[in-house]
Each structure stands twice: as structure tokens, then as C-alpha cells.
């Protein structure tokens, strides 16, 4: 199959069986809709959605896929679920994704992000049709030295807090499984993907910047911010998802040539401080939106994080399409449409279509 480099190819995905963990989460719901729009046969395995409202429910994501509620920490259930489906492609996104939550719940964070990954990969070993595995970690998996040149894929794993550390551990698990069990000609090809702070319509999670901003705007309250100078690699959710899909395509077609770690982050100019994000969203929202500073002492969060994505650009021909200003306007527009009662399934598919074209 001749594919154009750097393009998510809908004819490749048509009728491919894709097993997706974490499909009820924010990124998982967007990816489920994108796969459905290309006529992939999708089975999701995840906990119940973790907020009310949530994108999975509001955009009727479960209508065009098989959806199983389960915990990746349950080896028997995840193994049976995956084996019964016998996928062509596996994308592992299920995780405990929050830094501050990980301080309160370190055991749950490690058991989900480390042993959960072991369980998913262990289950994958038994699937005879499986050719391509993409396991998602985070930009926070790197040992954060505060360098501002951008972390490269070969930089050391680390993590100051339990969440970041658990994702560094997951990367070590993926690397060991790749070399031990997924390196023969007859096995699936396994890669990891590391992305930054994803943003987009339909994120209602606790303790995340954009949802916190939108909740305050809705109530006409000022947004209270703890680290206005904190810089993050912000990117629209469809940017890394396009990277995951491109990577999965290449693993399926070209095998071990692409079986390694990959960074998917925004352009340098989109690594902006929190205060800049707030100012843009205040303008887009209108209606007297505002923000103020939280003076309480807060747990440590890494002050500077940036990814070097030149490898993905050179070898996968993946590059970000939307700048941050555009993305923030789209998020405000998405949320205001939601408040007006617009059909959010159609709204998401329209956004995916706009991204592709």
C-alpha cells in the first residue's frame, strides 16, 4: 500500500481492527471519533468516564464502536478482552494522567501507569493478528534538568513527582518488552509516543488549566491561577493524535524501522506561559472574563518543559498544523457551541475534517 508520508491515510485505516485503551478519556474519545470517521473497527477498553460532563458521553462516542468498561490493572479481563477482539493495531492510552493527584495517590498512579502497561503488553503478546503497537506516555517522562533546548528521545528518563516518574518507568517497561518480546520478524512492532500538554474542546478534567478556565468563565468568576509564568508545550489534541496514527501506520507497514520512542510536541513559538493563554482566552470569551493569582503554596511542578520533535518531522514527516492562538479560539468556540446545545458528535467530526484538510 503506497502511503503519502506525513498523511493519516483513511484507506489504510478502513476495516482495520483497532484496540484502544483509555477510549473514555479526553484524548481517547477524540481518537475514537477519528478512527470511526475512517471506518476502522474500534474496540475500547477503559474505566468509566472520569468527569461529568465528559466528551465520551456528550459526543456519543460509544455509538459506533465496541466499548468495554474495565481496569488495565486487571490482567485477566484486559487479556480476554484483547484476545477475543484480536486487533491489527493496539493503541494504549489508559493512564492516571494528573501530577497533583499522583502526590495524593502514588500507589494507584504507579500500579496503573507501570503495571497497567505491563498488563497491556503482556496481553498483546497473545494476539496473533497484531502488527502495530503504540504506547502513549508523556513529555514528563524525561529527567527534567530545566534545559531549554528541548528534550530528545535519547535523553534520560526520570520524573520529580509520582506521575512523571511512573511514565518514565513505563518507558523502561516498553523498551524492555520491545527488546525481549517484540523484536522478531513474526511479532508486532512496538513504539512509544511522548506528547505535551494537550488541549481541545470537551476536556472537563479536574486540575487542568483549560477546563479550570472554562469553568470559571461559565460562572462569570475570575480564574485563580497558581503558576502564571509556568511554560508548557501546549498543543491541540488532534496534533499528537495525528502523530500516533502516522506512527501506527508506519509500524504496521515497515515494522521495526519505527519501533522506538517518538516526541510529538508543538512548534517552539507555541511554548507559552500560562498568563499568555489566559489573556488570549479572556479576549476570545468576552463577557467580562478575568483571572487572578493564587498565593497558596502549591506542590512542585516542573517549570520548563519542551520537546525536540525533529525526528518525527524528518522521518514521519509529522509537523504541527495549528498554532496555539488558533487552537484556543477553536476551544472557546467549541465550548460556547456546547453551551448552546449543538450536536457535539458532528462538531468534533467537523473539527477532525478541518484538521485533515
Q: Which stretches of residues belong to each language-model region?
A:
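NAD(P)-dependent short-chain dehydrogenase/reductase
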Residues: 145-150, 154, 162-163, 168-255, ...
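Generic structural signal for alpha-helix termini and adjacent loop/cap motifs
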Residues: 105, 123, 127, 180, ...
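C-terminal "lid/loop" region of Rossmann-like NAD(P)-dependent oxidoreductases
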Residues: 259-263, 272-278, 286-304, 344-356
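Residue-level signal for the nucleotide or nucleotide-sugar donor/cofactor binding architecture
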Residues: 8, 73, 104, 112, ...
Amino acid at each position: 500500500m503506497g502511503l503519502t508520508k506525513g498523511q493519516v491515510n483513511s484507506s489504510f485505516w478502513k476495516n482495520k481492527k483497532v484496540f484502544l485503551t483509555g477510549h473514555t478519556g479526553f484524548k481517547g474519545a477524540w481518537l475514537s471519533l477519528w478512527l470511526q470517521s475512517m471506518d476502522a473497527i474500534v474496540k475500547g477498553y477503559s474505566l468509566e468516564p472520569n468527569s461529568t460532563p465528559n466528551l465520551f458521553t456528550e459526543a456519543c462516542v460509544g455509538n459506533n464502536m465496541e466499548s468495554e468498561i474495565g481496569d488495565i490493572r486487571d490482567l485477566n479481563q484486559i487479556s480476554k478482552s484483547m484476545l477475543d477482539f484480536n486487533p491489527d493495531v493496539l493503541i494504549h492510552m489508559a493512564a492516571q494522567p494528573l501530577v497533583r493527584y499522583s502526590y495524593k495517590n502514588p500507589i494507584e498512579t504507579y500500579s496503573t501507569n507501570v503495571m497497567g502497561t505491563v498488563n497491556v503488553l503482556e496481553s498483546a503478546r497473545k494476539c496473533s493478528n497484531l502488527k502495530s503497537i503504540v504506547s502513549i506516555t508523556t513529555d514528563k517522562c524525561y529527567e527534567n534538568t530545566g534545559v531549554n533546548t528541548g528534550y530528545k528521545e535519547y535523553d534520560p528518563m526520570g520524573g520529580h513527582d509520582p506521575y512523571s516518574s511512573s511514565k518514565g518507568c513505563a518507558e523502561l517497561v516498553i523498551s524492555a518488552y520491545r527488546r525481549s518480546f517484540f523484536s522478531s520478524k513474526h511479532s508486532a512492532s512496538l513504539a512509544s509516543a511522548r506528547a505535551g500538554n494537550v488541549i481541545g474542546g470537551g476536556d472537563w478534567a479536574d486540575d487542568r488549566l483549560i477546563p479550570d478556565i472554562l469553568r470559571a468563565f461559565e460562572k462569570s468568576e475570575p480564574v485563580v491561577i497558581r503558576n502564571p509564568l509556568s511554560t508548557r508545550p501546549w498543543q491541540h489534541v488532534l496534533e499528537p493524535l495525528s502523530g500516533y496514527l502516522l506512527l501506527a501506520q508506519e509500524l504496521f507497514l515497515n515494522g521495526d524501522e519505527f519501533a522506538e520512542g517518538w516526541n510529538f510536541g508543538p512548534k517552539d513559538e507555541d511554548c507559552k506561559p500560562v498568563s499568555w493563554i489566559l489573556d488570549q482566552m479572556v479576549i476570545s470569551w468576552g463577557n467580562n472574563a478575568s483571572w487572578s493569582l493564587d498565593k497558596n503554596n502549591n506542590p512542585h511542578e516542573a517549570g520548563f518543559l519542551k520537546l525536540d520533535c525533529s525526528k518525527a518531522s524528518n522521518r514521519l514527516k509529522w509537523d504541527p498544523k495549528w498554532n496555539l492562538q488558533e487552537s484556543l479560539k477553536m476551544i472557546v468556540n467549541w465550548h460556547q457551541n456546547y453551551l448552546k446545545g449543538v450536536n457535539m458528535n458532528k462538531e468534533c467530526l467537523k473539527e477532525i475534517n478541518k484538521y485533515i484538510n
